[in-house]
Amino acid sequence: PIKKFIELHGLNRAKVAFKKTYPTDGNWKLTLDNFHECYHCLPAHPEYCHVHSKDYIQAYGAGNNTGPESIEFNKKLSLWNKKTEKLGYLTGEYSDSNFSNFFRSAERTPFDGDRLSETKDGKPGSILMGKFKEFDGGYTTVGTSPFNSFIMSNDFATIFTFIPRGPLKTDVEIMWLVHEDAEEGKDYDLNKLIWMWDKTTIADKKIIENNQKGVMSKKYVPGPLSEMEI
């Protein structure tokens, strides 16, 4: 069910532009919990919030379909779906049931305004990939398991792998993929490509490590993630 979302981006004709590992002093469960919820994004991740709309972030909440219903975002999504389908590109979403052993999910989501890519200025970060002949103003998110995620603009893909290294250590590995014919310095600027997720993951590393210190404390008392938490 998620294959068609990945095939849209032509990863079979991609190459690794950059790879970085973020060693994190935190349990794998804390690390994954942090990655899969977005209540902390607005106060903690200015770079991510610069790229992604507030309506989407609040609607995402602590994971797909856990946040409050966003009428404004649903309007944007409906209009974008119609426009994108006219271009002949895939839209929609998929999610395993809550009792699935796989935790698979996929969705296509619009950016705000005239943004085309997950770059700071919203302009293309590289040449188009896969089946795209022109930019559709959206991106694709795919989860193949709790430990692996793909976040793909039309022009580059960011692949996340979470690797437990011990009870209190987790490696967060990120690969940035571009079209196999793309040339660094000509078709893409590496710093522009990695900007958002590099900044965001460095901030997440600190958050996770602080959470781990709290969990290890005898005085730790868990609380809600947000006043919006349902």
Regions found by a protein language model. Give the residues of each.
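C-terminal catalytic domain of Rieske-type non-heme iron oxygenases
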Residues: P1-I230
